[in-house]
Regions:
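Low-complexity, glycine/alanine/valine/leucine- and proline-rich hydrophobic stretches
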Residues: 151-161, 165, 178, 182-189
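Short, charged alpha-helical interaction segments and adjacent helix-coil junctions
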Residues: 2-23, 27, 78-81, 85-90, ...
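Extended serine/threonine-enriched, polar tracts that run as long, contiguous segments within proteins
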Residues: 168-170, 174
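Accessory alpha/beta interaction modules
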Residues: 1-163, 173, 278
């Protein structure tokens, strides 16, 4: 698809995509789960802790570099007791899940220490790894990691305040009906389904209300912000050409536009400013 087609069809594509959008779509997830009431509802359901009170919730959190690698967490929340919750939504088929979770724990701890906390003050951190498929292939919707301290053939609970929960949307688990129902909703996000409290309310608002649609369109545009930025820059090129009566090439040079982008701008100006490009 050309850059012009990309820009012209953006609203049309958005309308179709929004109706099918679910929590496994990044542009939808980052809006839905940043809502504090929604985040609280989801955490209470997944952790079976109805008393969680979320004070702060952010999505796509960029944190300081860890071992030279940029770290971005899908959802990072804090409750009133100081506990930290990291929810990671895995859509694609990946491997080394346990190493990914180890990295998420390290990233969160690294950020806490960077902000001046002592080791003894490290709060409990929960990493909740949500996947579309049953990555462990054991037929369960939920997997809880428990650490133990082994000695003389015995084993005691080893509590380092790092907790890991794996949840998947593939298995319909009769022993985890509430979580399975939530995962089913994650996959569909039907605005007519009102069975999931704050989550259902916000999804319905985003999908059916004009103001909610506008919020989602702004988020959807982020995925195409490079093309949209070029569209704005094309206006600048045309203005320079008209005001100063210079060539297309001269306008590009004035704005210091890289040579590899020249064809895109030529296409944009031919479409939006055909008289200028004659």
């Amino acid at each position: 698809m050309s850059i012009v087609e990309n820009i012209l069809s953006l609203r049309e594509r958005f309308t179709a995509k929004l109706q099918k959008a679910n929590i496994f779509d990044n542009f939808f997830m980052r809006v839905v789960l940043e809502n504090k009431e929604v985040c609280q509802y989801v955490l209470r359901k997944l952790l079976k802790k109805p008393d969680i009170i979320v004070l702060d919730c952010k999505t796509e959190v960029q944190i300081s570099k860890l071992f030279g690698k940029d770290s971005r967490l899908d959802v990072l929340a804090t409750d009133k007791t100081g506990k930290i919750f990291n929810i990671e939504i895995q859509k694609a088929k990946e491997d080394a899940h346990e190493l990914r979770v180890r990295y998420y724990h390290s990233a969160v701890d690294s950020e806490i220490i960077r902000k001046g906390k002592e080791y003894s003050d490290l709060p409990p951190v929960y990493v909740i790894y949500v996947s579309k498929t049953d990555i462990w292939e054991k037929g369960s919707a939920v997997y809880m990691v428990e650490k133990s301290l082994k000695y003389h053939g015995k084993a005691d609970i080893y509590d380092d305040k790092q907790y890991t929960l794996y949840v998947n949307a593939e298995v319909k688990d009769n022993s985890e009906q509430d979580i399975s129902a939530l995962m089913e909703y994650f996959k569909i996000c039907n605005p007519d389904d009102d069975t999931h409290g704050a989550l259902s309310e916000y999804v319905r608002y985003l999908k059916t209300d004009k103001k909610g649609n506008d919020i989602m369109y702004d988020e959807f545009e982020r995925e195409f912000e490079g093309d949209i930025r070029k569209r704005t820059k094309a206006d600048d090129i045309a203005k320079i050409m008209l005001d100063f009566k210079v060539s297309f090439e001269r306008a590009l040079k004035t704005l210091d536009i890289p040579e590899e982008e020249h064809d895109d701008y030529a296409e944009l100006l031919r479409y939006f400013y055909p008289n200028v490009m004659q």
